[in-house]
């Protein structure tokens, strides 16, 4: 692919990734839920107004680890066997966005969550980042960030289940522990980002990738300043007593798996769960505002590309709202794989646009390379968004086909134009509704159909009417597309490096 000329000065790049953000939880959307309209997401609204919001953008998987590796490589992570949890990992042989930008003279930093799910080889410093502050696990506690918190858990839990609890100090660079008391990850990560933007990078442009853990579980750990804003009651914390009350996991009351089955799958509903979620969303939005303000104060905003996205769809266990989309994280329903993407660069790209073009998080790698003046690798599955962003004729039809696959059980999905074919993608779980602002369980579970399902997403975006019997030729066509795609992918499994 040819390099697109954009001028001599390389832009700075800031990528901000939310965790499990509900598709509808942005207040600039016409159909945003009432509670979002009330609290607002003013800084994400501002970013969208300064750029382009994509309403038909997709993650490469409905879960964290595979989706994150698909984004950072611009490729289907299934090419090296990363379909689902337990199959994860990012080979060091894969070219990533920061690796490619370093070759163009960029300084690079990663802040926040990593979760490439493959051990020490997945550390950010092994994949193109010069600096790192955050954690490499699937989750981390929002406020229990000190060695004292870790010790309290060890004492209360007698050493059990500590590997998955993810409590205690953060990590800086290659192993340095950062123990923080009276801290809140969203603010820690925001301050670190602002400090990096403000420092002297010499003649180097910078690439900053900030991955908030908001709004991933455990959202029930809330910064008290934000708790007050959404009407949550005070929840004092006694570190020495190590008293964890529902919905917090208590290691003395049984194993993590049993707790997660109950809480994580809504076997027991947290009435205040949505308010907890909203408090974290408010904190993240404030952080994004501080980052935008810092860029402006330093005279960098016009020449800085800001990208905002979520890793995957919103999840029911943190009470995210996916609006009219069916399904949640973990599912191949639109609510599991469709995500918001916002792209903004005042000096180079149009502002105040909303696009319904079908795009993917994989497209961000080639887009960044084009704007940085680099050559786009030929083996990427993503396509540059510049023709779409600049309203060029070639951008009217971006991706003809996108594919998702669980790697087992014949569970896969193909989107081709207006059509979506789902094969053995069924999912059933508990559900809830809101009464007087609190979550309550409902008798009927949420069900996404199994078997062969064909949906016309233009006429039926909620995926309610199966048209497979009426359009057997379309079912056959999309099945062939999946077969051809799968033949290019690896078998499920961990990479050798």
What do these predicted regions represent?
Residues 15, 23-110, 119-120, 124-132, ...:
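Active-site segment of extracytoplasmic enzymes that catalyze sulfate/phosphate-ester chemistry
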Residues 105-117, 372-381:
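Short, well-structured beta-strand/strand-turn elements
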Residues 98, 196-198, 410-416, 420-422, ...:
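Short, surface-exposed beta-strand/loop micro-motifs that present aromatic residues
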Residues 9-14, 50-55, 103-109, 127-130, ...:
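Loop/turn elements at helix/coil->beta-strand transitions in domains of secreted/extracellular proteins
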Residues 1-9:
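Bacterial Sec-dependent signal peptides at the C-terminal "C-region" and cleavage site
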Residues 116-120, 315:
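Active-site environment of divalent metal-dependent phosphoester hydrolases
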Residues 18-38, 46, 55, 85, ...:
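Active-site-proximal cap/lid insertion segments
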Residues 97, 113, 364, 385:
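Short active-site alpha-helical segment characteristic of glycosyltransferases
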